[in-house]
Structures are given as structure tokens and as C-alpha cells.
């Protein structure tokens, strides 16, 4: 699958006026979590709720990162999700859990996010 980038707004879950726009988020449905640059999360007051969470990178390297909670907005869609405090050298990613929470799917042919349709009730 070819990759593409999107823009999302990230907001503090307690004070939605504290927010920032991330302009180059790699859409990565192979990554479970969304990775947001630490300085951006710190600037809007997102707390580090889970510390030293272990992750295995695509190359097999094992690392730890902190995780917090944020509102993620794309167009008219929004969700509350766990976000990883990405460090220098980490990619900024919009991951599968956020895509599911936003009820969006990847249109790889057109390289864009589209509404996933009605939610399953059962």
C-alpha cells in the first residue's frame, strides 16, 4: 500500500481550546497507536498518563514511550484516543485505533481518508 499524509487537529481532552494542528501525519493503518510529536502534546497540556510503554518498531527494535489521552479531529470527525509522545526521530503517525475511532477508512487508490459508513451495532 502506498503511503500518504494528512492533517489533523489534536486537542486537550479537558480544555478543548488547547489544541494544535499537525500538518504531516503519516496515515499508517499498520500502527496500532497514533504518534504525535512530544513538543506538540506538551504545548497543549496533554499529560503523560502511561509511562515507559513498550513498543516493537517495524525493524524489530524495542523501545519505550509515554502515552496520554487526546482528542483527534479530522474534518467533521473526532475521537478521544491514546496517543504516543513521539520523540525526535520518530514518525508522526495516525494509527489504526484512531482511524477506527474516527470511523474512517483508507482509500489507497485516491490516497485519502473516507467515511467508513454505518457502525456495526452487534
Describe these PLM feature segments.
Residues 1-122:
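Pepsin/retropepsin-fold aspartyl endopeptidases
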Amino acid at each position: 500500500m502506498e503511503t500518504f499524509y494528512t492533517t489533523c487537529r489534536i486537542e486537550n481532552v479537558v480544555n478543548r481550546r488547547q489544541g494544535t494542528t499537525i500538518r504531516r501525519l503519516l496515515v499508517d493503518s499498520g500502527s496500532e497507536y497514533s504518534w504525535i510529536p512530544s513538543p506538540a502534546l506538551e504545548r497543549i497540556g496533554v499529560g503523560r498518563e502511561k509511562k515507559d510503554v513498550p513498543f516493537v518498531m517495524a525493524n524489530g527494535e524495542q523501545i519505550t514511550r509515554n502515552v496520554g489521552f487526546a482528542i483527534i479531529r479530522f474534518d467533521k470527525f473526532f475521537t478521544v484516543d491514546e496517543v504516543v509522545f513521539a520523540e525526535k526521530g520518530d514518525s508522526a503517525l495516525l494509527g489504526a485505533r484512531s482511524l477506527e475511532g474516527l470511523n474512517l477508512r483508507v482509500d489507497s487508490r485516491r490516497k485519502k481518508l473516507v467515511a467508513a459508513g454505518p457502525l456495526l451495532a452487534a
